[in-house]
Structures are given as structure tokens and as C-alpha cells.
Design a protein with these regions (language model features):
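Conserved donor-binding loop and adjoining core beta-sheet/short helix segment
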Residues: 1-101, 105-111, 188-218
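Active-site/acyl-donor-binding loops of N-acyltransferases
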Residues: 3-13, 17-27, 40-42, 98-116, ...
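A structural signal for short, well-ordered beta-strand segments and their strand-loop junctions
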Residues: 81-87, 137-138, 186, 243-247
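Aromatic (often tryptophan-rich) hydrophobic motifs at membrane interfaces
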Residues: 183-286
Length: 348
């Protein structure tokens, strides 16, 4: 029955969904970029942040039926540069073509324990943690849970993802921690919690909710974010664990959270079943600038691939996490055509 219900919802979502057009300056090219989005508010807000770091104009199309969306895509006539269509397999059957990409909404990564500080950034975090004498403690009392929720977790999510963010409810968090299968680990400086993270105690423990007090820059500069990875790793090592799930990340390879986890030798281990179709609609310089600036992970035949985009003038140098099936490099020719330049497997 649950599968039938999910299928009905998927079909309904594929037939009719919210639509927007975002337009603004693409910073790499300095030219106007117009993006069509079909899906939910959270993904729309994500694309707005990724495509337009400054600001953009948002045009609501209201609820759009599948046939209307198809008409918009076919009749864009160069007025649109790019489309993102959120959904699952029904959406892919309706809208995805051979030249399109399918991006999972999230990927998850794991790291071996103990954590090895092999990168320059990881070593710098450890140095700053020692400099500021950061420490940690496990707490499960109501005042600590409420302080973490209102002053650490919630402000961090809102600052990063905006007012339409999904925020776990306080009662749900309290029940999880008080039940014993979730641990609240707080990062302290001078006797005050400046950051924290919730650890889900599964066979491969997972970092769940975390943040920095009031999302303050001064605490981040103390390596408070790094501490929410290092101290849980040390605690779990003491408990006999050999791996830690670093939690979910967005699939754009320049995403700060994903890049940070890569510092600790993250390996991508899983992905969401649902995602977004990325559909190039033009060969404009603004589209080329966006793709070169925001390479991403996509799904094909059950495997995850990094997709890097280059121009004749510039080669992509973004770091690619371990755990993917391979890396694909694409080149934009002078006339704006996208050509696959190279594909390498993870074993090469």
C-alpha cells in the first residue's frame, strides 16, 4: 500500500508542480542567466543561491501542468538558458533527454576512524582547536537540548538555507536524545557551548543535526565547525567504531559543506533516490559560466559521476570526493556546443 501511495504522489507531482523563472547576472560571465525551475521551494532556493550568489529576480509561474512545462521547454527559443525539474522516475520518463543530467538531492559520505588530518585545511583546524582550547561533553538534559536547538542548530540552518528550510521539531529532537540512541555532543570554549552536533548511534554512527552558536563567524574562526567532526570521531573511536557517517551534503562540488567533509577524506557512500533533472537549453556564455563554476554529481545507470565543465580558456580544478564511479570532463567549444572530453573511472 505504501508503494502504491508513493507512486500516486509521484505521478501527481509529475503532472502538476510549482514553477518559477529566475533571472540575474551570472558572475563567471557577467551576462544575464535565465533559469526555469519546476519543483519545491527548497530546491528553488538552493538553485537561486548556487546560480546567483548576489541576488536575482524571481518570477512565479504558479502551478504548472506537465504539458505546459513541456511547451515552455520546447518553445523557449533561446530565452531560457537552463532548467531544473525536481522529481523521480516519472519525471525522468517525461522530461529527461540524452543530453540532460540527473542530480540527486543529497549524497552521504563516510570516513574511516580515527580521522586522519592529511590535508592542509584539516591540519589548520586541529591547530586552531588547540590554540583556543576547545573541549567537548555529552549532554542529555532538557536545558542543554533546548539551548542547542534554539541557539545553535536552528540559527545555523536558517543562516545557510533560508526561511523555507526544513527544521526538525524540538519535541522530535528531545525524544531522540532522551531515548538514548542519539547523543548530543557540545563543543565548549571557556565553559560555554559554542557549537554542537547530534550523533545517531547506528552500526555506522551518523552526524545528524549540528551548528555553531548564533552562526557566528568568530566561533567558526576558532574551528568550531571542525570540532563538530573531530570530537565525535574521537568519542566514537573510544567506543570501538571504525567508521563515521558524515551526514548529507548537496551535490554541487563547490558546496562549502561537501568540500569541508572532503578535507577529512570523505567517501561518498549513498544518495537520495529522488533528484533534479538539469536540462541545458542554450549554448550561451552565461550557461557555460554557470556550469564551469558549479560542477556537480549526477546519477547514471545506478552510479554516481562527477561532471566537470571546461572552456577553451579555463580548465576546472575543483576537488572530487572519493566513492564515485568516475569523473567526466566536458568541453564547451567556441560555438557553445557541449562535448564530452574525457571519462575516467574511479580505479584509474
Amino acid at each position: 500500500m505504501q508503494r502504491l501511495t508513493n507512486n500516486v504522489r509521484s505521478v501527481a507531482g509529475a503532472v502538476r508542480s510549482s514553477g518559477w523563472v529566475l533571472e540575474g547576472e551570472e558572475p563567471e560571465s557577467g551576462l544575464p542567466l535565465r533559469v526555469l525551475i519546476s519543483g519545491g521551494h527548497r530546491q528553488k532556493d538552493l538553485i537561486a543561491r548556487v546560480a546567483f550568489p548576489g541576488s536575482c529576480r524571481e518570477i512565479s509561474l504558479g502551478k504548472v501542468y506537465a504539458w505546459q512545462l513541456m511547451s515552455l521547454l520546447r518553445g523557449s527559443g533561446g530565452e531560457l538558458d537552463l532548467a531544473f525539474i525536481e522529481g523521480g522516475r516519472f519525471h525522468r520518463r517525461l522530461f529527461q533527454s540524452r543530453s540532460d543530467f540527473y542530480l540527486p538531492l543529497w549524497v552521504e559520505g563516510v570516513a574511516d576512524l580515527p580521522l586522519n588530518a592529511t590535508t592542509r585545511g584539516a591540519k589548520e583546524d586541529l591547530r586552531r582547536m588547540r590554540k583556543h582550547a576547545l573541549s567537548c561533553e555529552l549532554r542529555g538534559d532538557t536545558p542543554a537540548i533546548e539551548d542547542f536547538y534554539h541557539n545553535i542548530y536552528r540559527p545555523t540552518v536558517l543562516e545557510r538555507h533560508g526561511p523555507d528550510s526544513h527544521i526538525t521539531a524540538l519535541p522530535e529532537l528531545s525524544r531522540a536524545i532522551e531515548g538514548g540512541d542519539h547523543k548530543l555532543l557540545l563543543i565548549n570554549h571557556d565553559g560555554r557551548a559554542i557549537a554542537g552536533v547530534v550523533i545517531v548511534m547506528t552500526p555506522c554512527p551518523r552526524l545528524w543535526l549540528g551548528g555553531v552558536r548564533d552562526s557566528k563567524k568568530e566561533y567558526r574562526q576558532m574551528a568550531a565547525v571542525g570540532a563538530t567532526y573531530v570530537f565525535p570521531a574521537r568519542y566514537l573511536c573510544e567506543q570501538g567504531y571504525r567508521q563515521m557517517n558524515l551526514g548529507r551534503s548537496r551535490v554541487f562540488l563547490n558546496d562549502g559543506v561537501l568540500q569541508y567533509k572532503n578535507k577529512w577524506n570523505q567517501r561518498i557512500c549513498s544518495h537520495d533516490p529522488d533528484g533534479m533533472i538539469l536540462k541545458p537549453l542554450s549554448g550561451s556564455r552565461s550557461l557555460r559560466g554557470f556550469l564551469a563554476r558549479q560542477p556537480f554529481v549526477s546519477i547514471e545507470n545506478g552510479g554516481l559521476y562527477a561532471n566537470l565543465f571546461e572552456t577553451p580558456e579555463e580548465k576546472s580544478l575543483v576537488g572530487v570526493p572519493d566513492g564515485l564511479r568516475g569523473t567526466r570532463r566536458y568541453l564547451f567549444s567556441e560555438n557553445g556546443c557541449l562535448e564530452k572530453l574525457q571519462e575516467t573511472s574511479a580505479n584509474e
